[in-house]
Curated annotation (Swiss-Prot):
Pfam families: Ribosomal_L36. Keywords: Chloroplast, Plastid, Ribonucleoprotein, Ribosomal protein. GO terms for molecular function: structural constituent of ribosome. It comes from the Eukaryota. NCBIfam families: rpmJ_bact. Belongs to the bacterial ribosomal protein bL36 family. This is Large ribosomal subunit protein bL36c. HAMAP family: Ribosomal_bL36. One of its GO terms (biological process) is translation. It is found in: Plastid, Chloroplast. One of its GO terms (cellular component) is ribonucleoprotein complex. PROSITE patterns: RIBOSOMAL_L36.
């Protein structure tokens, strides 16, 4: 899980979602997991 100020899609499988008011990126590749913060 990477914590970044600006999250973005890295590949075509990445999906942007909101969980508990935080913007997150989930993907089939675990290295692409990101959370805004």
């Amino acid at each position: 899980m990477k914590v970044r100020a600006s999250v973005r899609k890295i590949c075509t499988n990445c999906r942007m979602i909101r969980r508990r008011g935080k913007v997150m990126v989930v993907c089939t590749n675990p290295k692409h997991k990101q959370r805004q913060g």
